[in-house]
Amino acid sequence: MSKPITAIIVGAGHRALIYAELAITNPELLKIVGVADPNPVRREMCMKKFGFSKEMCFTSAQELAKHGKLADTVINGTMDHQHLETAIPLLDTGYDMLLEKPFAPNEEEMREIVACAKKNNSKVMICHVLRYTPFYYGIKERIVSGEIGDIINIQTVENVSYHHLSTSYIRGKWANSKECHTSMLLAKCCHDIDIMMWLMSETKPTQIASFGSKYQFKPENAPVNAGTRCLVDCPLVDECRYSAKRLYIDQPERWAFYVWDKLEHIENPTIEDKINLLKGDSPYGKCIYKCDNDVVDHQSVLVNFESGATGTHNLVGGNSASLRRIHITGTKGEIYGNFEESKFYVSKIHPTTTDEKIVEEVDLKVTGDMVGAYGGHGGGDERLAADFVSFVRGEKPSLACTSIFDSVAGHLCVYLADKSRENGGMPQKVIL
């Protein structure tokens, strides 16, 4: 039996720790041997959880790189705009890498990281976790089998629930593009555009156009008597659907890893601790209409492919529930379904039947957290981490494996979609 690969966590945030959980559930595959993070609380937590010494705790990727190669790989879960400054020194030191998506905030940094990986012959895998869910993996298998023929059109939709949108993209880390260096489309939908590129891998994108705006969450749309902080001066605290009390105090476990991160130094924070945090300077206590958000809350993308096929992706935020929907039309049939229902349908042309078609329901029977509110993504997270081990070992990875080179098309399409949106929908040429 092969020894587990060794890994150091760089950026001990929510996503990196989810992938590192494989070392707990499957210690024969992965062993966490160190951490690099500026937060002493997180360094201490990782040291205790994974059982390594204080000598393997570092304050930054740069400090880690100065010590030479101390493990087989790193799990890079730093913020999007930190990927260049953390990835380059570690790849140059000889580490292979599991790198969170989006792996770069713009085309220039994307190409620089790709060039570094190529120069060092590094094995770099991007965390496109939705590829690993039974839903999308199952659809990919049916397309590869040729059941629906050549793809003519692919339509994807992502509805972002009101509580996810408000927590992550209005009040949270990805609300302001100047601070997080990431657009809404890149932060939320590089998943979806990657899925489109993966399912259309027999051809290449050639042109992109896009429209979108910040439509709903701005000061002029606030109720007349709304305050500035929900728990401090707002008379609507008990009735507003975006009230910090209703979203975070009444539902303290939902998105807890974002909302309560400033309380992580307290072992068991009380409700009073949480109320005081939201009353203070926490962005999660702000009126939803009076934040410093500048990202869009809806956007549509149109893609033209070399084969003549077309694709569309629609992002809409503020819905009653999260939803990912897909509909693929081929020359012999269609595949369509909703990710949250964990089932899809294969509808094939059949002129001799009464309905002139044959429809097969594929029920994957996956339950649990499908949107990541508690960390899960329909089972994709653990499968991705295990596939990374196979990738690093040089074993044959799964159909879903996304090397950094496979991820370029999806990222580039997002950058160009945003450029098109910023220029009134002007089509952009895709040069891979």
Summary of predicted features, one role per range:
Residues 50, 295-432:
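C-terminal helical cap and adjacent loop that interface with cofactors, partners, or active-site loops
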Residues 130-286, 424:
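Predominantly a Rossmann-like dinucleotide-binding segment in NAD(P)-dependent oxidoreductases
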